[in-house]
């Protein structure tokens, strides 16, 4: 290779990332217009398009590099020099951290995810931790109650870029003040002030004002979801001021926000204070930088592994028929490998399973489906693997494993947030906790269905419980669109003997689902059955599901709330007039 080519390649990769992030910001900047036009289908399509941008631009850069090198192979020394040149381009680059991830992605695409060593990749960042450039303008603006909180909130709302009319601005302001007074007390509220992000956070059918409520005793989140009435008028649906509520809003089971962030590292740092339980990976994920979030997630895994004496074990719960799931006992993630062969009743291919996981990545997860990161050629030290798990891996996924002596390489796996399997949770709880879990499960099914997702296998073992008590779906191999399912009533038996027969007395075609049958496996436990019948009996009726299908086919997009119905102002305070 001619000398000087290394710098050209490094510059080409960085220019490719510039193009990718420019398009990322372009799609993001259209969020306000889509919201104001109430074009919810465009919102969903923009979300998918933005997810695809990264891989598309990686592919473009790879083709450019193959042209530059005339398809010639490159030796290790050449690649190291390319990385050295690339590193020298980063000290004055504003998005250095994601640029490093982009370099990694290009390298992996060029070399088929092989030879992934720290010398060749940015396994850890080359730049000082939390290094920032001069920010062209502040990320947030401070508002002080010099003339009272009503005046302060009027200024906050008047500062918003939204061009639609407000349904009743005074009412919403008084709702917020009432909530803040109940939360802080009059005296503390008088001594508090707000810091509000300059950019709105758009997701689904809401525009979120994200801020910090700075009180004498500390800083709290200040989140206002702004919605539209059917007449296109704006209203504030609630005010959230706890870290637990904020954590759910920015949760791993939700779609990524669209927030204009030319300097994502600075925004992530600003968010840390109100989301103390979120890792760096989770914060990048929340603002849509999902590929860099994957890098940060891998770094978090490596740091944990270096500091623990644990071995990987099979994850607790009922063993799956499609996926082999393992974890580190103290780590908050699970690792999922597609088995070489599935149980006989699972008539599907590995390609189908991967397509289901990609569907979830691109779809609106409505807070009810866990996000995943996909890895290829994942290296594990044998000393970190328990003997029982090693035996299981070789038994169930040998075709995906390469033995390197002291290491194994798993050709493909997913990493996902670890949760308590719902079936285990239900065995351990009683009283109100049991009731809450059943309510959550039914709500999860309803919200998934309203978002055009049918889980397929609705057994409790396929759902998990988060640390906030939310029920989230995580087994995707039978997932499909609601509109692909034929929901049927079971025909009445022709003769009394029909009900005793081993075979059904009616025909069953692929895609047929009989909701009446759900009762058999969801209500078998006498502690659970009465609760289910009380709260979710309509899930056992085919007409309920068909009505949802009709709404979806008519183009209706349901509202998705990242908080309980009882937290909505309209429920808490009613239509109070001001």
UniProtKB/Swiss-Prot annotation:
It comes from the Bacteria. GO terms for biological process: glucose metabolic process; glyoxylate cycle; tricarboxylic acid cycle. It catalyses: L-seryl-[isocitrate dehydrogenase] + ATP = O-phospho-L-seryl-[isocitrate dehydrogenase] + ADP + H(+). Keywords: ATP-binding, Cytoplasm, Glyoxylate bypass, Hydrolase, Kinase, Nucleotide-binding, Protein phosphatase, Serine/threonine-protein kinase, Transferase, Tricarboxylic acid cycle. GO terms for cellular component: cytoplasm. The keyword Cytoplasm applies. One of its GO terms (molecular function) is magnesium ion binding. It is found in: Cytoplasm. Its EC number is 2.7.11.5, 3.1.3.-. This is Isocitrate dehydrogenase kinase/phosphatase.
